[in-house]
Amino acid sequence: MILVGIAVLILLAVFAILYYKQKEKFVVVGKFVEPIPSNPGQDFTLLPMDQTYTFADPVPDTATAFDVVLSRFTDKKAPADLLKGATFPEAAPYTDSEVENISKLALSRVKGPDAPVLSFISVEYAAKGVDNKKNTHYDIAFMVYDQVKNFSLKLVLVAVLDAKNKLWIKKFSSFNSFTPKDKGPKGVENIDETPLAEFIPDFVQFSRLYKDNANV
């Protein structure tokens, strides 16, 4: 019985190691050729690799006017060699100031006569990974303050910082902006109202969205 108990404990330990090892990784941004079955709204169709390829997530018909404006600041095209030959990125540690700087760098692009005036508040969620080409992949949810409308607003950012420190933005939108029934960006409340909208990280559940590509 003792041997059986030891064997069971060993098996549990092995399963635990495999589980957490899998959890340490997240998906390459923009690498997949086929649309994801569980998220058909995303299209990763690639153009010939000797040209630039489609990079930014498509803007859905249900997007709010706010998100249509934000989508202008994504990178619609990226060099073919940006992720060509890139490996699955390994999770990497990050500092608060690092992800704050990436968020502020993306936010600095939001300019124009019809663009909102947004001030950075804080990062709520972040994930970071590095591939074999030294590209750094970021997935960040952060809060901003709309100075004109007096709103606090949650934004999502999916971006790649290449080896030359150029930031390529794949997704930049209000939180849960892809929901058809939205009348306005979710995660938005008057700054005087508390608490803020509950944070539900459905846009970063890579284990669910990309489970069919787990071995890519």
Curated annotation (Swiss-Prot):
A single cellular component GO annotation: viral capsid
Q: What is its main location?
A: virion
What inducers act on this gene? Expressed in the late phase of the viral replicative cycle.
Q: State whether keyword Ribonucleoprotein applies.
A: no
From the Swiss-Prot or TrEMBL record, state where the protein is found: Virion
Does the record's keyword annotation contain RNA-binding?
no
Taking the record's annotation, the residue ranges forming a coiled coil are: none
Region Hydrophobic: start-end pairs: 1-21
> Keywords on this record?
Capsid protein, Late protein, Virion
What is known about its subunit structure?
Interacts with the major capsid protein.
Domain observations: The hydrophobic region might anchor the protein in the underlying inner membrane.
Query: What does the record give as the function of this protein?
Result: One of the minor capsid proteins that constitute a network internal to the major capsid proteins and outside the lipid membrane. The minor capsid proteins glue and stabilize the capsomers.
Name of this protein: Minor capsid protein P6
